[in-house]
Amino acid sequence: MLHIFRGTPALSNFRLNQLFSGFQQDNLPIVSCYAEFLHFAHLSEALTEIEREKLEELLRYGPTQKSQEPYGECFVVIPRIGTISSWASKATDIAHNCDLNKVLRLERGIAYYFKFNRTLTAEEEQQLVFRIYDPMMESIVRSPQEAAVLFEQHDPKPFTTVDILTGGHVALEKANVTLGLALAKDEIDYLVENFTALGRNPTDVELYMFAQANSEHCRHKIFNADWIIDGKKQDKSLFKMIKNTFEKTPDYVLSAYKDNAAVMEGSKVGRFFPDQDGQYRYHQEDTHILMKVETHNHPTAISPFPGAATGSGGEIRDEGATGRGAKPKAGLVGFSVSNLCIPNFPQPWENALSKPSRIASALDIMIEGPLGGAAFNNEFGRPALLGYFRTYEEKVNSFNGEEVRGYHKPIMLAGGIGNIRHEHVQKGEIPVGAKLIVLGGAAMNIGLGGGAASSMASGKSKEDLDFASVQRDNPEMERRCQEVIDRCWQLGSENPILFIHDVGAGGLSNAMPELVHDGGRGGRFELRKILCDEKGMSPLEIWCNESQERYVLAVSPEKLPLFEAICQRERASFAVIGEATEQQQLTLQDSHFNNNPIDLPMNILLGKTPKMIRDVKSAKVNNPQLDQSMIQIKEALFRVLRLPAVAEKTFLITIGDRSVTGMVARDQMVGPWQVPVADCAVTTASLDSYHGEAMSIGERTPVALLDFAASARLAVAESITNIAATDIGDIRRIKLSANWMAAAGHGGEDAGLYEAVKAIGEELCPQLGLTIPVGKDSMSMKTTWQEEGYQKSVTAPLSVIISAFARVEDVRKTVTPQLRMDKGDSRLLLIDLGEGKNRLGATALAQVYKQLGDVPADVVNVSLLKGFFNAMQALVKQEKLLAYHDRSDGGLIVTLAEMAFAGHCGISIDISALGDNDLGVLFNEELGAVIQVKESDLKAVRAVLTEHGLIHLTKELGIVTADDHIEITRSTRVLLSEKRSVLRGIWAELTHQMQRLRDNPDCADQEFEMKKDPNDKGLSAYLTYDLNEKITAPYIQKGTKPRIAILREQGVNSHYEMAAAFDRAGFNAIDVHMSDLQKGRHHLQDFNALVACGGFSYGDVLGAGGGWAKSILFNTALRDQFSAFFHRQDTLALGVCNGCQMLSNLAEIIPGTENWGRFVRNKSERFEARVAMVRINNTHSVWFDGMAGSHMPIAVSHGEGRIEFKHDQQLQALKAQNLIAAQYIDSQLNPTEIYPANPNGSAEGITALSNSNGRVAIMMPHPERVFRAVNNSWYPENWQEDGAWMRLFQNARVALG
């Protein structure tokens, strides 16, 4: 039974305007358009009137917009037929938690109603639907009733076989094409031989499983191959050269090359988590660091948002599935694409070269892909703190003569760090009889063949196979799974997880064989035990689909009840689908058809398949020098500042949460003006320590068009110069991930790959003492297609991306690029590791003038590079550096400009001592760094540089000036004289243009104007209370602690830092899941206070916090329990972010809240992660007692934080009753509605409210993430351990006596 509920208008005015702009570009005869949400309820039986009203109320969410009666021709966009959207999964969960159990499934679509001034042609109709839906993720039907196709169920399909006993090689070769297996000829021979020996035909499931498990993507055949180059056999494989770094420098590495991530030694700190009694406590223990970096290039090319989202999601699962369970902590994301070609923003280096229709454009990838990666990290609850973005697309004379090189097949990099207990670093043994479990979401017919598909050059696979390999993301489900893993590893020696892997490429067909094989066992499985959302799937589709957010585990039978209880509490789906066997055989039984889709010896599936031999020839390049004759410095700088690799990247940063965990010490944004120029990311190891972790990225991929080895060396070196200004100590503490992207088989590239791997694996890294314990390769970076009868291709440069990871001794000592004006007289020094060579080949300067040049930068002297790192470490330890920024893309002139942008100051520079060629001096990208040093410290700094052999490379540049001017001279000749604010505006143009295309253009314009304002004062802080006064001391000395419920729902992700803040204030912080209240394991009558934590309950489906609130309001027992708690006179309640949204939806049961508004989508219509300033007002709130008149920065991370009132009188009443506890203010300290000082557009900057008796408070920003000073992106130097917001938690402790 299907019931359709109309929803609110789906598009805001500016979204409609954007849509109409596209229609106008296509010359479509559209007079009007109206779009509204439709909700489709698939019911087991008819609803009662009460149930119908409840469901209607549940489906009422979002900003209030005036609906209209639809008219015109209807086009309904629904989830792709045959799939179940992640929205549906979460909305259905909410319905069931509201006791609406007749709802089998909820889905959502958008109905578009168009009025035309004439009938559309078939081509015009295609243009129209292309503007309103994504064919990879959605379908179009022509009426709401036709959406019933979403809920059709089909009978299960049987497996098929390939008749090789009769047809031999020919039959398998045909199946290789139709199934998209990407099998090589020797693999076909291998399979025919083995199945002939078994005396039977292979099933399609077995072939698909073999193809995925043995794809280049999964088995890394090229990196394990034997090599012959120019007729000479090479001694080592690529992988052996990488492993050489570990053989030479095994120091501090605990696990390498054998798990989902590598592990290195960390610090002994207090890890904070709840014990089995539910109380959060610190646990002093060795907390090691895990690291992993993946790529997800093919899916991102086909469908950017889910491709990038599942790229981040898969890498997060890799971290969680390390050892016997670990905790992901902080992430990185990177993109390489072809030229953007932004409409109305043409750049002189861009040509509108063509592309195949099946892949997304570079612009679409950079609009949708970053949103996907950010959305997954945000919803999972992992801060994304680091990244890179490069564009390249040019016809160049390289190793094969003139050809187009670029990133039509993009690079989507996803990586990060996590933590793991010492006892869980190594995986356990799998005993015979161990239960084999799939943890996570149900199987769906999506993401088929991703491993094999990503192993082909783009264009080799059929478009329908590309379509099938697109995946779907549900980060809230992955968060639930991670909570299960966390509960398990937190049990220490009682951890029920013996073995764990994530489910990625190839689905269960790769994950389960890998699990049992690594555990030395076989496995017997029952197909129909696998959770499935689509009953008509074939065995191949069930076993091989790549439905995301899944893990496979081995659990001993006696620990199974414990594991089940943990899963049920976290509402994480799981299924016991088999058990480990002594016999090395993989058997998959199908009880529905009473047959075995798989019955295969493990040694055939994962045995000695034929080893690849790469017999290749090297190539040389002979390119002319960079023609400098027509290049002027000012115009060159303007161009370079607009080049995406150099330009400001705020549009990629503020979409990502950078404060969740409460352990972020250095994000991308630097200083009071929050300028995105940080060289590295830094986290604290725990919530009670200054030890930590750092990570950085190095990449110089265009250099590979001239010199493969130099490109690899520079990537390693840049990762070091980026991380050098944090307190690491021994360079051997740094561990690298190497991600290799190449167009294998393209002339010269294979030999170039070998040359690059050798350059760092055999030479540079061993010489520096660096280890590469982890990495990934993608060997199909070429796009080919037919166009008007011609064969076309675009080939990516050989691309090595290096990510560096290190333990940090003291995170407070990290030095940023922000030039300081508050430290007296100072000097700027350049440490030139290029030794004056000033080479310009493959630089940003060359790129913006559509050239390549001849000789690129390179590592000149390895010992000096090592000496440079050691010198910086000494200066960091001694706190002799005021600012530090490495030289990279754009050269010295960009390094200096970015430092001035961060410091909101001017500079006066003389380059006389740096060489004779002005362009070479200013725009070369040789290794090096600029440091700012106090004049009084110059002698001591020079002594350190002398000690490390660098003094002859150190040149004094000039001074910092307290004005809005950047001046560069050669002695008395002025080379550049320009306002800093003008250059700052040019640097920001790319972000401005991308934000206008993607977000609310009014908001984009407001932020752009703010960046150019020389009078912007940036962030500041003024406190009306003593930050260091221990106001809770008298109460803590009593020896009793009030109990606070740290309340969370599925998808909440900020509970650890919240608990830590209350624990520090003197509370017993107790972990309380909503399922505990539902099942009676906890009751609110046992608590003195509750806090509803931030995150994404139910993934913000049905309105942020709305589903959580309605699961309380529509459950009589829970409603009564919460109402009783709020009406007690001895309790306190706080709601932060998602908890704020939730409590605002509970206002009807909270006394004194009749004028509260509710929180809806931000004005920008984008998730906003910012550091904003707020002012505390004078109210009755006990939470803000003594803080009135203060203003200070605070972390903001939300997508729905704009307050909306039913009527204006509510706002006036709040003001009259003094219930507005805090407001966003601008740099002039006035309440503001201007973006981004007000990140969500709330009226009068409202961001916190109190109820009338002062005991309940709600606020959208996150005080719990910045209760320690060190976790503020910027804070005054006189702040010590506690941050300004610790007082809020202390006030609560005082209020309870």
Curated annotation (Swiss-Prot):
Its EC number is 6.3.5.3. It is found in: Cytoplasm. Its main location: cytoplasm. In the N-terminal section; belongs to the FGAMS family. HAMAP family: PurL_1. Phosphoribosylformylglycinamidine synthase involved in the purines biosynthetic pathway. Catalyzes the ATP-dependent conversion of formylglycinamide ribonucleotide (FGAR) and glutamine to yield formylglycinamidine ribonucleotide (FGAM) and glutamate. This is Phosphoribosylformylglycinamidine synthase. The lineage of its organism: Bacteria, Pseudomonadati, Pseudomonadota, Gammaproteobacteria, Pasteurellales.
